[in-house]
Amino acid sequence: MLKEYKSVQEVVGPLMIVEGVEGIKYEELVEIQTQTGEKRRGRVLEIDGDRAMIQLFEGSAGINLKDTTVRFLGKPLELGVSEDMIGRIFDGLGNPIDKGPKIIPEKRVDINGSPINPVSRDYPSEFIQTGISTIDGLNTLVRGQKLPIFSGSGLPHNNVAAQIARQAKVLGDDAKFAVVFAAMGITFEEAQFFIDDFTKTGAIDRAVLFINLANDPAIERISTPRMALTCAEYLAFEKGMHVLVILTDLTNYAEALREVSAARKEVPGRRGYPGYLYTDLSQIYERAGKIKGKPGSITQIPILTMPEDDITHPIPDLTGYITEGQIILSRELYKSGIQPPIFVIPSLSRLKDKGIGRGKTREDHADTMNQIYAGYASGREARELAVILGDTALSDADKAFAKFAENFDKEYVNQGYETNRSILETLDLGWKLLKVIPHAELKRIRTEYIDKYLADKD
C-alpha cells in the first residue's frame, strides 16, 4: 500500500524534509504532487527517526509546503530495459527524447545495481581496438577494463569520445558489440554534436545515448551514469554483448554531488567535495568488468576535465586510485595542432600487457611499445637540451632520437579525428618511425623482430 503524507516541513534547494513518516526505505522513489496538481519525482536520501530527506529530480520551485502531497512508492529508481534501447536517445532519467516510441521493457531494474562478487570476476585479457594509435599501440584498452581520459577545459575530449564511440570494436570474433554513451552536464551545442556525430556516421545503430544537459537538475546528473551502467549490465550479462561505456564529464557529476552535499549541510572534504566522493565514484567505476561463465563484458572509459589542468585535484586523484590507468590530453600538444593531443609519457594502461602479443595483436607489440616509449622520452630530452645548448651539443644518437620524437608527434599521434587505424597499421607505422634510430640503440626489441619487421621498412 502506498503511503501519502502532507507533512512537508522544509524545502531547501533540491531537498525536501517530510516529518511523521514510517516504514520507508533509503533510496525509495517518491512522487510529489504540488498544489497545482503537477507531479514531480524524487528519492529518499536520508532517514532520521520519523523525518525523511527527499532529493527532488525536477527542482523545488513553486512548491507550497501546506498543499503538497508526498507519496512513497515502495521501490527504488528503476530503468525499464530492453534490446530495443539500442539506437535510441534518453534523458538522464531514462525517458526517450528522440521522438521515438516508448520502450516496452522486458524488465525493470534498480539503477544502483549490485556489486560483482570478486570471486566471480574474470580477469580482463582481450584487446579492444579504438582505431587511435596512441591508445591501441601504447596504452592498450582491454575488454573489462576501466581506463579514464583526463582532459582540461577547452581541450577536444568530446572529439576523442566521439571518435572512440564510432571506431571501437572487438577483434577476432563476431560477438555483438554495443556502446553506451552517457553525457552529464553538457551544453545543448555539445549534445547536438554527439547526436549528429552518432547519427551521421551510423554509430547510433549500435549505441544507447543518455544525455543530461547543463540546465537539467543536478539530481538527474547523479542518476545519469547509473542509468547508463544499468543498461550496459543488462546488455552485457543478460544478452551476452560486449559493451563499451563512455561517461563524460565526471567533473560535472562530482560538482552535482558537491551541490547536493552543500544543500544537506554536510561537513565538506577536500575542495568542498563530500567526504564520500571516493566511495561514490567507486560505485560507478567498479561496475565494469567480466563475470566468469558469462560471455558479455563491460569496459569503461570515464572522461573528466581537470580543473586548472591540476592532476592532483580530488576528482582525477581519486579516479586514478580506482581505475586502471589514465589517458592524458596535453594542452601543449593541442596548441601545436596535434589531433588528438594525447600525451603518451604520463598516460598508462595498467592492463595493456594482458591484451597484446601473439594471438591478440601481434608478437612484436610489447617490444615495439617499450622501444617507442623509450625513444620518445629520449627524443624529448634531446630536444630540450638542444634548445639550451644548441644542436652541436647533441650526439648522433641524440639527434636520431630527437628526429624520431618529431616524426612521432607528426605522424603517430597526429592522426586526426576521422582516421581509423587498425592495430596492424599502428604497429607497422611504429616500425617505420623507428627506422631513424640506429639499430644499436634499439635495445628494447629482440633481434629476431628487428630482422623480421624492420627489414621490411627499409
From Swiss-Prot:
GO biological process: proton motive force-driven plasma membrane ATP synthesis
The UniProt record lists the keyword Transport: yes
GO-annotated molecular function: ATP binding; proton-transporting ATP synthase activity, rotational mechanism
CDD domains the UniProt entry points to: ATP-synt_V_A-type_beta_C (cd18112), ATP-synt_V_A-type_beta_N (cd18118), V_A-ATPase_B (cd01135)
InterPro entries: ATP-synt_VA_C, ATPase_F1/V1/A1_a/bsu_N, ATPase_F1/V1/A1_a/bsu_N_sf, ATPase_F1/V1/A1_a/bsu_nucl-bd, P-loop_NTPase, V-ATPase_su_B/beta
Annotated keywords: ATP synthesis, Hydrogen ion transport, Ion transport, Transport
Pfam family, one: ATP-synt_VA_C
Superkingdom of the organism of origin: Bacteria
Keyword Translocase among UniProt keywords: no
Any one Gene Ontology cellular component term annotated for this protein: proton-transporting ATP synthase complex
Entry similarity comment: Belongs to the ATPase alpha/beta chains family.
HAMAP family: ATP_synth_B_arch
NCBIfam families: PRK04196.1
Protein function: Produces ATP from ADP in the presence of a proton gradient across the membrane. The V-type beta chain is a regulatory subunit.
Identification of the protein by name: V-type ATP synthase beta chain
Organism: Fusobacterium nucleatum subsp. nucleatum (strain ATCC 25586 / DSM 15643 / BCRC 10681 / CIP 101130 / JCM 8532 / KCTC 2640 / LMG 13131 / VPI 4355)
